[in-house]
């Protein structure tokens, strides 16, 4: 079988609802790589939050920050930071709305305020500690994503920023990306680098930030626990993550000999 490019989201896809990796997923990912397929993590997370999962699964390629930072075989092949002036203007709006922000750089993150309950809950869901506080951290640095902590109905106040796209990942937080940025854009950069046809690309996901990725690749797989919008556009809907959904889909799609 010719090798394929296979992209996996993390939460609700690689990770089950207890933030553990099912044994069937471990074995499937290892076998995909053993048989010559290129396996990627494709996540909204930062490189430093993706790293433990990469090490655990022996994966050396990833798309992070929803497509803004791409690595193939341990080499950075694409970076797309947010414009500093636009960050400054958004921070003014966030300050007026009393909405905390977390700056996400390549190797660290900083918060605009300390000990905010919404940040504590959102960041805690990523199994990481509350970031240090530095409201000017973005100045002179490459910031690839912001975490804006606001309720869904409060998000409308940020529609006037054409430089950004907002993608909700938590009931209390939304990712702030460069306009047009997505996991699909990250995959395009991989395909530009490697001689692969779009028909040889597969992606697995469960959330709203996977929509463009699932729609773009040759075969998009929605987990059984995915949001309805993703299931509607997927080429294949597998079993939930808690029911060995990745292993089931890989078998049904004939990706292993």
From Swiss-Prot:
Its EC number is 3.1.3.-. The keyword Metal-binding applies. One of its GO terms (cellular component) is cytosol. Its cofactor is Mg(2+). Signal peptide: none annotated. Keywords: Hydrolase, Magnesium, Metal-binding. Phosphate binds at residues 10, 43-44, 183, 209. Gene3D superfamilies: 3.30.1240.10, HAD superfamily/HAD-like (3.40.50.1000). It comes from the Bacteria. GO terms for molecular function: magnesium ion binding; phosphatase activity. Mg(2+) binds at residues 9, 11, 206. SUPFAM superfamilies: HAD-like. The keyword Magnesium applies. The active site is at 9 (nucleophile). Belongs to the HAD-like hydrolase superfamily. Cof family. This is Putative phosphatase YkrA. It comes from Bacillus subtilis (strain 168).
